Amino acid sequence: MIYRTLAGEKVSQLGFGAMRLPQIGGQIDEKESIRMIHHAIDSGINYVDTAWVYHNGTSEDLVAKAFKGGYREKSFIATKSPVWLIQKDEDFEYYLDKQLENLQVDCIDFYLLHALNSGTWATCKKHNAIDFCEKMVKKGKIKHFGFSFHDAHPVFIDIVDAYNWEFCQIQYNYLDRKEQAGLDGLNYARSKNIDIIIMEPLRGGNLVEPLPETVKELWKSAGKQRSAVEWALGWIFSHKDIGVVLSGMSTMEQLVENLAIAGSNGPDCFTSEELALIDKTEELYRQNTRIGCTQCAYCMPCPSGVDIPRNFKVWNELYMFGKSETARGAWQWIDAPVRADKCTRCGVCVSHCPQQIAIPDELEMMVKDFAG
């Protein structure tokens, strides 16, 4: 494992994201999830990331169970404040205390104001979030604090300029260099000596499968053959100015592959030719992808029962595969009660989407696309 610095701490460059844990029947597969976290820590990962909302509020409890037997002492723990639930100043400590209880710890190493955007940042300012975090550091309930971000670049700059932050967490991958905070935001934060955590390095798995045929052909021309995961993660690891790269792994096979990549790809690991190849890859994806959904599921649950991430995933695959009959047939594999055509345009989902997608409009377009 290669290690980097985050808020003065020595951290593994690959972090374990407890957002997409293995499941059975819609619930966390506890045994397999714990086995994976133990293997991750035994293999050198020392940063485990969770949040109040992950897995419908059960991720923190699972991490607590995984940290028994000495594993807590071997790893940093990160979780996040559910800012969207805050209605008064005191709510911040109420939720923090609940999270300390969930995680069965006295102190959280890295605490983030979760998924900041213009609305939740206004909540933070109204209810004195920064003052709260500073007080919690003094109380010993948290060690370091920062924020995670999902909004437009100007909002990111406003938040960065508001405080002397230790670190921030941004979405970044070779398709998102100009999205949200983007590369310019990353560089701006570093100019302020703010350390960087990367999320969505595989764009919710969309950079792994299904691969457009044009991308497969392009990669065959590379001098060194890499898997889709290594192209995506390796490109991130080649950056010097980052700390932890989070990956939400759902299987032991994914974990083993990511560990191997993290152990052999560090700063400047890509040649200039490989970097140029990634630039071309981005161009090809931009030509094929229909919508920028990362499958984060922040839009869920839908009041009308629509499985929004699954619908958008099928829609993107339709375009990646050139609207083939096989891709078009995937629509039939979505259960009728959760298909896009059940959307009532209530709009509840829109404010929760980190990608700022006009979800009802896009679902309507999707229905027309598959009908055509």
PLM region descriptions:
Residues 24, 84-199, 210-216, 223-224, ...:
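Glycine/proline-rich, positively charged
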Residues 2, 32-36, 59-66, 95-99, ...:
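A general structural detector for well-ordered alpha-helical segments in enzyme core domains, enriched
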Residues 1-75, 138:
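N-terminal binding-site loop/beta-alpha segment at the start of enzyme catalytic domains
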Residues 54, 58, 150-151, 250, ...:
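Short beta->alpha linker loops
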Residues 17, 51-54, 111-114, 148, ...:
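Conserved residues at the C-terminal ends of beta-strands
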Residues 47-54, 143-147, 169-170, 244-246, ...:
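Short catalytic-loop micro-motif centered on adjacent basic/acidic residues
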Residues 16, 33, 40, 48, ...:
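Conserved, mostly hydrophobic/aromatic
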Residues 45-46, 65, 184-372:
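Structured C-terminal cap/extension of enzyme domains
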